[in-house]
């Protein structure tokens, strides 16, 4: 995210993100929030394409770029809509290779909602339609359902999500690059869902302040650093044969301890109640203290 998203630090500027990346040892970091008009102008003013790494960007002020952290152009969008008679709230991560593609996507999305209201805009459109707009902006767009198990705002969310990727994205399911674990789950938990065998699994920090950068991350092995090789790595990592490794693939993810994640268990913080799913079922989904839904 950037400083233009709600509940984020004012230090989340391009410079602040690079400083955090250097401290944490991160080579590639997302800009976040590229649809926000003010932030997009700031990104265009401060970033230039990396001379050797296609699809990556560096700060103009960077004196030495050879080993400096680089940016990818990223955006999280909140899709709020009704589908099959149920309200849906779904967060989707979009990654694009250049500013021309960003401009095309922003032009399309500003007809649907107010992009200046929030760095992570809330748009009245389906996840499927957002995916189509991203691919129309650039056929190499990366579409990643964000923190897919978050109850209220995700593809598999128990409150407003779906039971499958295909049910959510329809014909666009073929174009999903990967799924993001979120802080409350890890790859081992996600691999228990057979449908996810066809998708790469990634983890990101979802930072709302510089110190949260890198609390989760994805480690890639690539022939050379570039947008296309990251894209190829995601494609190759859905069903990875470790005996015949491709040139580009996901080596591993760095995980937050999922049991400490906000949504790993059900509960009420104010009532000091925390339940595993079995306990939730025994209590009919209600808090034993206040009798409200967990």
Question: Predicted segment positions?
Answer:
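Hydrophobic faces of well-ordered beta-strands that scaffold small-molecule active sites
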Residues: 1, 29-31, 71-75, 143-145, ...
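Acidic/histidine-rich helix-loop elements
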Residues: 2-11
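Short secondary-structure boundary/capping segments
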Residues: 10-12, 43-49, 158-163, 195-196, ...
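Divalent metal-dependent hydrolysis catalytic cores, especially in the metallo-beta-lactamase
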Residues: 18-39, 142-144, 178
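C-terminal functional module detector
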Residues: 19, 37, 45-48, 59-63, ...
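Active-site-proximal loop/turn and secondary-structure-junction residues that shape catalytic pockets
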Residues: 35-36, 77-79, 147-150, 183-185, ...
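Extended substrate/RNA-proximal surfaces in nucleic-acid metabolism proteins
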Residues: 40-177
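Internal metal/ion-chelating core segments
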Residues: 162-213
């Amino acid at each position: 995210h950037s400083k233009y998203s709600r509940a984020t630090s004012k230090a989340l500027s391009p410079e602040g993100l690079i400083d955090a990346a250097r401290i944490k040892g991160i080579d590639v970091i997302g800009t976040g929030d590229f649809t926000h008009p003010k932030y997009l102008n700031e990104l265009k003013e401060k970033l230039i394409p990396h001379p050797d790494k296609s699809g990556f960007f560096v700060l103009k002020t960077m004196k030495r770029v050879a080993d400096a952290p680089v940016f990818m152009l990223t955006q999280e969008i909140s899709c709020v809509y009704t589908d099959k008679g149920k309200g849906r709230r779904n967060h989707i991560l979009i990654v694009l290779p250049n500013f021309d593609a960003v401009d095309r996507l922003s032009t399309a999305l500003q007809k649907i909602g107010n992009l200046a209201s929030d760095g992570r805009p809330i748009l009245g459109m389906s996840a499927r339609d957002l995916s189509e707009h991203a691919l129309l902006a650039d056929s190499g767009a990366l579409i990643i359902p964000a923190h897919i198990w978050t109850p209220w705002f995700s593809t598999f969310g128990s409150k407003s999500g779906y039971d499958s990727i295909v049910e959510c994205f329809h014909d666009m399911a073929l174009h999903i690059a990967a799924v993001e674990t979120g802080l409350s789950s890890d790859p081992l938990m996600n691999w228990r869902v057979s449908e996810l065998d066809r998708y790469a699994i990634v983890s990101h920090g979802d930072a709302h302040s510089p110190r949260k950068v890198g609390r989760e991350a994805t480690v890639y092995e690539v022939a050379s650093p570039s947008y296309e090789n990251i894209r190829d790595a995601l494609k190759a990592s859905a069903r990875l044969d470790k005996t015949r490794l491709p040139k580009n693939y996901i080596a591993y993810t760095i995980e937050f301890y999922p049991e400490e994640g906000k949504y790993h268990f059900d509960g009420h913080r104010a009532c000091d109640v925390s339940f595993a799913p079995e306990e939730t079922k025994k209590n009919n989904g209600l808090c034993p203290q206040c009798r409200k839904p967990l």
